[in-house]
Amino acid sequence: MTIRVRFAPSPTGMLHIGGARTALFNYLFARHHGGQFLLRVEDTDRERSTPEATKVILDALDWLDLKPDEPPVYQSTRYARHREVAEQMLAAGQAYRCYCSREELAEMRAEAERSKKPFRYDGRWRDRDPAEAPAGVDPVIRLRAPREGETVIHDLVQGEVRVKNAELDDMILLRSDGTPTYLHAVVVDDHDMGITHVIRGDDHLTNTFRQAQIYDAMGWARPNFAHIPLIHGADGAKLSKRHGAVSVLQFRDEGYLPEALCNYLLRLGWGHGDAEILPREEQVALFDLDGVGRAASRMDYAKLLHVNAVFLRAAEDERLAADVVARLERDHGFPVSTEAAGRIAMLMPGLKDRARTLAELAESALFVVREAPLPMTEKAEALLTEAARDDLAALLLDFDKTDFSKAALHEAMKAYAEREEKKLGAIAQPLRAALTGSTVSPPIDAVMEALGPIEVRKRIFSVLGE
């Protein structure tokens, strides 16, 4: 049997990290077992589902490198098939037409409230002669659900869960306008797509009993179900915007790497030893559902920042430099010349060691593209005393005698410090302030080599007032 799983988002908004983790678990499960990962867009909410929202979800999955093995299936294109299955159930006596009016249903709800019981349709049209149907009423089609016994689900994460059939009512399969309900459409689509494992959030667990009854009524084999716990905020409440970023593309825009976000989400609810950082190939090799816990996970943004910093330091300099250039132009409004882009690339080993996100990385590279005189932090300004400016003027003369390589510049600073009987830091920090406007940067000899003699001279002269 070939394992086939699916991720089935509704395009009514952004892809949130809970959905992203569900997609990741499906993807890794399929890859681990040599199976196939599919995508179904559940766009049956015709008012809220938009092409723009669909594109946002597809872009987010593409950014996370969770690409489906087949073209996406759009649920809205399958209404005829959903109706066909409902008609088959009618013909087999597994479903029936219900002509209840809105007023009758409202009275049932009111009675349930008075009795302090959950609302359930009372089945009044279950065995009634359709000849008694009122004129001008378009019926819904309801499942003829079993009333005796239990429906049992053997969940691969939650274990065995069961419900008494008397607690379930005859759910609607087709609305009066002929459109399918969500629960019916999902079952038909999963069956037709050959889905073997349904891996989704445990907020869908109660739906599974009703969906299992549809499978049974059609004589179809049920897929395996695995309901994974939800992600909560640090306070244990349902994750929301007040906790921080929740949209996948918001994390992208804030400068998180996709592989870092996936790594963090994987470890949020799945465990395998003490390893915190796992490349994708190791994730595929190790992942299986037996490592998924039942308890809700808590989002830890500080931990995610740490994980992102680890991946940032390991990322290729060329890739990071290209992203920084794009962010400087898009987010900070600085046109970046080819020369400046080259300087950023040269400095990337030192820049990325201090950054936790791509946004921070771009901030730290601003000094490269700014023109002299540079804006100064208070700490940097305080370093540029009269004595420090004298040192800068003298250092320029020594630098002019070098080939402006990093090693030669370092030796020139070291020799000057020894000659003046000063610590190297007392020389390097004012120089850093003059060249970057800050007290934090990559090694200052690397900064000078990247900027080049003309730019270094221009920046020091601007501090000296020349």
Curated annotation (Swiss-Prot):
Look up keyword Cell wall biogenesis/degradation and say if it applies.
no
- Keywords recorded for this protein, A-Z: Aminoacyl-tRNA synthetase, ATP-binding, Cytoplasm, Ligase, Nucleotide-binding, Protein biosynthesis
Binding positions (ATP): K241
User: Motif 'KMSKS' region: which ranges?
Assistant: 238-242
Pfam families associated with the record: Anticodon_2, tRNA-synt_1c
The listed location of motif 'HIGH' region is: 9-19
Single Gene Ontology BP annotation: glutamyl-tRNA aminoacylation
Report the EC code(s) recorded for this entry.
Answer: 6.1.1.17
Any single Gene Ontology cellular-component annotation:
cytosol
* Domain of life of the source: Bacteria
- Provide the coiled-coil residue spans: none
Q: What does this protein do?
A: Catalyzes the attachment of glutamate to tRNA(Glu) in a two-step reaction: glutamate is first activated by ATP to form Glu-AMP and then transferred to the acceptor end of tRNA(Glu).
Q: How does it assemble?
A: Monomer.
Family to which this protein belongs? Belongs to the class-I aminoacyl-tRNA synthetase family. Glutamate--tRNA ligase type 1 subfamily.
User: What NCBIfam families does the record tag this protein with?
Assistant: gltX_bact
**What name does UniProt use for this protein?**
Glutamate--tRNA ligase 1
What lineage is this protein's organism placed in?
Answer: Bacteria, Pseudomonadati, Pseudomonadota, Alphaproteobacteria, Acetobacterales
